Amino acid sequence: MHQVLDAELLAASERRGGEPARVLDVGGGSGVWSVPLAAAGCLVTVVEPSPNALATLHRRAEDAGVADRIVAVQGDTDALGDLVPAGEADVVLGHGLLEIVDDASAALSALATAAAPGGAVSVLVANRYGAVLHRALAGRLVEARRLLDDDTGQLAASGEKVQRRFDAAELDLLLVGAGLVVEVLQGQGVFTDLVPASELDASPSAAEALQELELAAAGRSPLRDIAARLHALARRPH
């Protein structure tokens, strides 16, 4: 997914005549995505409801020397239209967002509205079938069956923050329903959580081989469909 994002951000900068790409990171938390993007030269606005997360973001940005490239806005996704201008962001990020909001469809529509015409929306979500597989392999068979049978991919009454998980078809329909054109729908973490750490430690070349395998498998169904996460890049039409 990093290659996809890097290519999109480069194209956005070129469309601006070499000026920095403008990124909106919704639910951006403590800056896991925004700080590296700012360090790469982007101008980033982060919308995040948690003041504690924003405080951590500020410290991270200061430490990285990119505080002047990040604007932090405290607020919820359902108020996004009141917090940021519509149609201005070259790339809108919703990474780890759609699983925890009350209304995933409304949230995605808000992300689409914030994107400039021709701009992109990048979403990263928990994969329902990946969660089923990982729990089964860990011996948590009852949880695996509950996740498989639940329409939202949620472990009801478990106290987990996640309200839903997605499969590839559901995510595609959600993006199209928000008026976006899906260009990339790939898996992230097909094998990484399954390969024993001892195997990676045993060979100096194993980590590189795993990365190459992940890249090769990311867009191939059915391997994509059992990844830990699903990443999509969708475009707002002109």
Please identify what each model-predicted range represents.
Residues S105-A120:
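A short glycine-rich, Lys/Arg-flanked "PGG" loop and its adjoining helix->strand segment in the class I
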Residues E19-G27, A120-D149:
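Conserved class I S-adenosyl-L-methionine
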Residues M1-E19:
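Conserved alpha-helix/loop element of class I SAM-dependent methyltransferases that forms part
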